[in-house]
């Protein structure tokens, strides 16, 4: 009799624990679904970025490059990420000096450096407790479009796909597991990338692949719309 009672109590305990575990899973799953983030659509606005007409193999010195932060503004980010908060941007310098050029002449030249050739955006998406999402845009070169075509093929090899080339002449994935694109449009060669901690609505793929394949193309379209 005591053995039967002990067995019954054990079974009841197991059932109670199972119900608690199941309830916890359901609550966490529901919380995750509520935190899923919708991806909007690119909505380019504002005036085109001023780029000079470059022909005959001309190359624009890095210190004359446009400000990278002028290609994407906060309203354009809000169009791509409805509900985004705490958007901040930071200009960062970029060096255009190759090691070959450095070997020939190691002296410092103002023309080799852009003080705002890269822009880093940080933001907080729904479900994040701090600004954990980042998007960055970096100018790689500005030159005669014919020169850019050959240069991009040489320095930015990767998986060619039209998925990211929304408005660009060409985009490549530089690595299958990397969340970045290298693109060209007219006289501009650029790279976009970033990261996030959230999951996205209606997308079964892991966040890094969704970021690369669905989010970044919207930024590419926003950027290339500024190049006339």
Where are these regions (language model features)?
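A small/polar (G/S/T-enriched), proline-flanked helix-loop surface module common
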Residues: 28-228
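Hydrophobic single-pass membrane-targeting/anchoring helices
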Residues: 1-36
């Amino acid at each position: 009799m005591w053995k039967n009672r002990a067995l019954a109590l054990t079974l009841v305990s197991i059932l109670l624990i199972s119900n608690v575990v199941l309830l916890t899973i359901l609550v966490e799953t529901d919380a995750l679904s509520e935190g899923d983030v919708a991806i909007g659509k690119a909505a380019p606005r504002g005036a085109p970025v001023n780029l000079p007409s470059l022909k005959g193999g001309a190359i624009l010195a890095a210190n004359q490059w446009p400000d990278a932060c002028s290609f994407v503004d906060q309203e354009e980010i809000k169009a791509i990420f409805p509900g985004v908060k705490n958007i901040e941007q930071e200009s960062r310098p970029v060096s255009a000096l190759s090691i070959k050029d450095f070997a020939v002449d190691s002296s410092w030249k103002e023309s080799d450096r852009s003080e705002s050739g890269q822009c880093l955006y940080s933001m907080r998406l729904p479900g994040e407790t701090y600004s954990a999402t980042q998007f960055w845009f970096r100018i790689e070169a500005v030159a005669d479009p014919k020169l850019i075509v050959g240069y991009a093929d040489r320095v930015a090899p990767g998986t060619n796909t039209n998925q990211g080339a929304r408005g660009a002449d060409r985009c490549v994935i530089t690595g299958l597991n990397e969340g970045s694109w290298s693109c060209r449009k007219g006289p501009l060669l650029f790279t976009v990338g970033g990261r996030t901690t959230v999951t996205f609505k209606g997308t079964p793929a892991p966040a890094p692949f969704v970021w690369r394949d669905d989010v970044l193309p919207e930024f590419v379209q926003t950027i290339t719309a500024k190049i006339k």
